[in-house]
């Protein structure tokens, strides 16, 4: 059961979803050349051990993420989502932005994977135990970031703007913000507070990218959650875990909210992006299709 003050490490609650995402990224491939979408993701799964290590080594053929339906569509989802946000940062870097903020960064390794312009600073905010696991794993493999990296241990439901600025962030300069896989883990009121804080810290010329999921009708949400729990393997199911952890509340639509505060915002359905960008689509009405059709990608620039 979620509470307003719950905390987690990498193996529990919301933290465990970071490992599921890492597993999806480890299994995901670029559609153009078959290269791994995130070469660091497998390191985290192996470090976590158990099902995650077995999964990326091909030792768990009965795992949900190994299935042809949900597992394949989840990996393709991770490939598409990762590429979308990678492209966002390429674009914002080209405009001269040199401050990047990753909210609920989890096991995101863009500070290592992407080629950043000189003097780019990347601020990564997440729970302390998640940050600890990430840092220890990267250090164990001698990984070196390609930007000036600032890992910040903080709960985003608390006052994180102060510690961000104390860590070197300058609100008078343009910045690029990423809100990936986060909003549905927040209550609607916490989402509004998060967006308000970003808006207050973002100078004109700043950019933001947001993953937004539409809210399920209440009856559909309860049916989906029950069905996912009933079909889960003994070790758990990423879909069942996800549905048990999110807040399925009516909430502000990010693009509309941002436009109301002077941002020029665009929104695209993830399935449309996948279709036009060469990513494999899940079969219509499959579990994968029904999961992804609620996901939208929002980008905005502050005037």
From Swiss-Prot:
The keyword S-adenosyl-L-methionine applies. Its EC number is 2.1.1.-. SUPFAM superfamilies: S-adenosyl-L-methionine-dependent methyltransferases. S-adenosyl-L-methionine binds at residues 126, 155-156. One of its GO terms (molecular function) is methyltransferase activity. InterPro entries: Ppm1/Ppm2/Tcmp (IPR007213), SAM-dependent_MTases_sf (IPR029063), SAM_mthyl_Trfase_ML2640-like (IPR011610). It holds the Pfam family LCM. Keywords: Methyltransferase, S-adenosyl-L-methionine, Transferase. GO terms for biological process: methylation. Exhibits S-adenosyl-L-methionine-dependent methyltransferase activity. NCBIfam families: mthyl_TIGR00027. Belongs to the UPF0677 family. This is Putative S-adenosyl-L-methionine-dependent methyltransferase MAB_0213c. It comes from Mycobacteroides abscessus (strain ATCC 19977 / DSM 44196 / CCUG 20993 / CIP 104536 / JCM 13569 / NCTC 13031 / TMC 1543 / L948) (Mycobacterium abscessus). The lineage of its organism: Bacteria, Bacillati, Actinomycetota, Actinomycetes, Mycobacteriales.
